[in-house]
Amino acid sequence: MGSLSPLSLLWGLLLLQGVLRPLRGDPVFIPPFIRMSSPEVRATLVGGSEDVAVSLSLLQVEEGVLPVPTCGGRRNETVDWNVTVSPRESTLEVTIRWKRGLDWCSADETASFSEPPCVLQMLLVSASHNASCLAHLLIQVEIYPNTSVTHNASENMTVIPNQVYQPLGPCPCDLTAKACDIQCCCDQDCQPEVRELFAQSCFSGVFGGHVSPPSHHHCAVSTTHQTPDWFPLLCVQSPPSTSPFLGHFYHGATSPRHSPGFEAHLHFDLRDFADASYKQGDPIMTTEGYFTIPQVSLAGQCLQDAPVAFLRNFDSVCTMDLEVHQGRDEIVLENMKIRTTGGPVTPTVTYEEAIDLDKFITSPDTVLSVGSAPRNVNVEEHYVFRWQNNSISGLDITVIRAEISAQQRGMMTQRFTVKFLSHHSGGEKEFSGNPGYQLGKPVRALHTAGMNVSTLHLWQPAGRGLCTAAALRPILFGENAFSGCLLEVGIKENCTQLRENVLQRLDLLTQATHVARRGNSDYSDLSDGWLEIIRAEAPDTGADLPLSSVNGVCPEVPARLSIRILTAEAGSVEGVAQREILAVETRFSTVTWQYQCGLTCEDKADLLPLSASVEFINVPAQMPHPPTRFQINFTEYDCTRNELCWPQLLYPLTQYYQGEPQSQCVAKGLMLLSLLMLAILLRHPWVRMCKARDSAAIYH
């Protein structure tokens, strides 16, 4: 058996020491050995951390000589290292940081993967008390030069690209900051010599950075793809600014970006709105920077500094721990000024007190200290912008606050809404489209009895998810959704009363009697496209059913509500498809509720889940046309199966072409017809016939 190297023997002794010391209650580093490849590492010293001094030394491992661990101060050879000790509860957190950083390693632009590490050392961290060694931490440092790190931070201002023409992240496969991602050819952090290694296996499609692929009808495609001979005659000549993929990635959600702790942060100047005018989707600016409101990202996290886009309504719900809550409660909204045309706009702020804290705060069973100072937290913030042309004319903010104890514990649910209203709109209901519905707009509804009902609803659970604390949110057109809540039921619950209670809660979601066929139907005129809701017969709540007399069992409980909405495309306005509602049906489904007992059946409240779902079903506006004899016999000329489409040869001259005004299409068609007739008349047979006719006239 071969002999062990000094480094392996030292590592084994320290590891054995780290395992045995906690058993005796002695101080020990966790972990006792670290292989360091980044500029910073951390370890924890546990057990007897009072009056302990931490020192760092550099081990000179020579072949055949095992260095003896010593406890002492910093030596000259460790001036490149920094040791920070942070006390924790009964422990010490030790941070070892390399002062030079990765920039010193990547200074040589000609570095390659085959070069040795720029830092190769062995460090020993010692904990001592009164010159007596207590514990040791061995660190093997191997830091390699990062050839993918580039230093192009010459600009001091960030340029946010227009998302209408490209997504905010033009290289989706660039997942690592300041580092080269393999097979990601659009990653600007990759050096040319590194990119050559995987140039033949780059990621394709949108993930690889091809966020705006050329259309297959574009003339530039013929240079890169195999195209038929007639393609140059029928291809489309258009600049990239009119690509059919514009705006395809525009409506994206916010996603967080995590940066390493050693990354250099530069100060970026904000975008200069000299004219203070906005376009749809532009971030709203204040006199101090971007106007931000917490929003939920794609990963489900709550981003505290997410910009608000102009004319983009949203409703976000964030959940946070009250113990570490550092929210927006200290922000003075009255001092905020919105930049816009005509000068800054000062918001009008209204404060209200929350009535039921159980809807917002879920507290554990803990006893709070008596006499602690209270504090205010914002549980809801509602922002209503008034816009006119390309500017903001006003901002109304409603803040719902709650007063809680300073020692309050638990989870708090916060809600933030942003709504844009026209400057000329009053208290009337907002349209959901003109005339057809827009995707994501509320389904308009009314009650013939004059009740204040404007839409259909689903549940928005909060806290423990109980129905008593659940809020309501509108049903949005074109978005299938499922929601639910929990109803507390006792073991001795009366089944008839339970059915009536459940049915009443489900009816609250669909109090309306009619829904609007179009997005701009008039609320004051019932004949202006209002459809009566088709309601399936609800189950009889007072029926005497089997098992109804048994405690803890209730059959035929209407616990599920399904809403089906039939929609169709009813034409187009200026080339934009207009969608409308054909019918709305509500139907109940029953379940058998049974009290869930453990080892013993105690008289405690059980939870009955109630659910409500909405489904949008698209119905064709007209039956599809049967295939013609030409399509059946000549499948190679079928427009739906082949690139070549002879029936659409004159498509620009038909009424279906909406790329240009019809008058221009007619003028171009007549000009083309005139040129065609002139070409036919000037052909050789016609010229010869004219010459023959002239010769015959001369002889006569």
Swiss-Prot record:
Q: How does it sit in the membrane?
A: Single-pass type I membrane protein
Query: Where does the record locate the signal sequence feature?
Result: 1-25
Which of the residues are on side Extracellular? 26-665
Concerning Pfam families, the annotation shows: TCTN_DUF1619
Which of the residues are on side Cytoplasmic? 683-700
**UniProt KW Iron-sulfur keyword:** no
Predominant subcellular localization, coarse grouping = membrane
| Quaternary structure and partners | Part of the tectonic-like complex (also named B9 complex).
Entry function: Component of the tectonic-like complex, a complex localized at the transition zone of primary cilia and acting as a barrier that prevents diffusion of transmembrane proteins between the cilia and plasma membranes. Required for hedgehog signaling transduction.
Q: What is this protein called?
A: Tectonic-2
